[in-house]
Amino acid sequence: MNSGHSFSQTPSASFHGAGGGWGRPRSFPRAPTVHGGAGGARISLSFTTRSCPPPGGSWGSGRSSPLLGGNGKATMQNLNDRLASYLEKVRALEEANMKLESRILKWHQQRDPGSKKDYSQYEENITHLQEQIVDGKMTNAQIILLIDNARMAVDDFNLKYENEHSFKKDLEIEVEGLRRTLDNLTIVTTDLEQEVEGMRKELILMKKHHEQEMEKHHVPSDFNVNVKVDTGPREDLIKVLEDMRQEYELIIKKKHRDLDTWYKEQSAAMSQEAASPATVQSRQGDIHELKRTFQALEIDLQTQYSTKSALENMLSETQSRYSCKLQDMQEIISHYEEELTQLRHELERQNNEYQVLLGIKTHLEKEITTYRRLLEGESEGTREESKSSMKVSATPKIKAITQETINGRLVLCQVNEIQKHA
């Protein structure tokens, strides 16, 4: 009894991570079909596969699928759980397939116990290959997950770069505004310093003027009155002295009143001046505050200058690098230009040679035409002379062309005719 067994099992699947999708569906083995015949006929055992979509339906791209919305870690965990459940189903189906194969082998052993064949080696090879396929699929899934993680990292870095670029632009705008503010504060500080200096000078002048006024109105302690009396007729000396004393007392009282009035006025003025130093101190406090602000702005300005110098260094490095590349490109272009110039010279030389050869060809064609006419004329003369029984002997000629070239260029061409004697 002859029997044939053919086993076909073609599971195939492709796994993709968050950035990809399921390629083609996994094919699961189903129950084998057995065709047999009575009376020792051939038995054919075949396994067919059916397509079974992966659990959870078909998956599209990672960005358009609803499964990938939300947190990326939760999505990847969900995908890993689905993959694990899918592999468990595959193992369960493989175990069911093995059970069916064992039942079929038992059935064949019962039908044909004499023709027992050992398929253990093939089964081991199949099992080993199936394990390799599963390992390859797992490795493929891990690689795709790594690729998706790398893509997500690249997207994050691009987003960070865009944010840093926008932040840099904002800082540049803010630095420009701070520079304008610094210029305005410098102008205001200069004006305030000039105003304070003017007020100090005015205060010094007022003090000097006050001292001068005090010196003018000051009555010295050794004030003496010198009285000179002319010796004239004798008058009442006591009465005259009394009148003079009263007059000078009136003058002294008037001076005292004037001094009191002037003192009160100067006291009021000094009280006002005493109040003005508070204003000066407040302005000095403002000046100190402006100086601190100015120092802070100078620090920020130095920081921005350092950033600017770093960017200028980067720009110079980039320019030097691209200048080197440009120089290389210019060298390549100059090399190709030299080759093009040589090619043009070569074409000109070939064109000159072609013109010379064309002239020689034209000259030869003219000579051939002339010889043809001469030959035709000689043939007619030969016919006439044949009638008169005259013999004509033709003398053949050999044309020798001599060409002289220097450095590949044709400089001389001669055509010589040599008669060939019979």
Curated annotation (Swiss-Prot):
Region (Linker 12): 218-240
Region of interest (Coil 2), residue spans: 241-378
Gene Ontology terms: cellular component: cytoskeleton; cytosol; intermediate filament
Ranges of Polar residues composition bias in the record: 1-13
Keywords: Coiled coil, Intermediate filament, Keratin
Region (Coil 1B): 126-217
Region (Head): 1-71
Region (Disordered): 1-73
Superkingdom, taxonomy of origin: Eukaryota
Rod-like helical tail: region residues: 379-422
A GO molecular-function descriptor: structural molecule activity
SMART domains per record: Filament
IF rod domain boundaries: 72-382
Region (Coil 1A) location: 72-107
Chain spans, region Linker 1: 108-125
One biological process term in Gene Ontology: intermediate filament organization
Other facts: There are two types of cytoskeletal and microfibrillar keratin: I (acidic; 40-55 kDa) and II (neutral to basic; 56-70 kDa).
Family: Belongs to the intermediate filament family.
Assembly behavior: Heterotetramer of two type I and two type II keratins.
The protein's name in its UniProt record: Keratin, type I cytoskeletal 23
Originating gene: KRT23
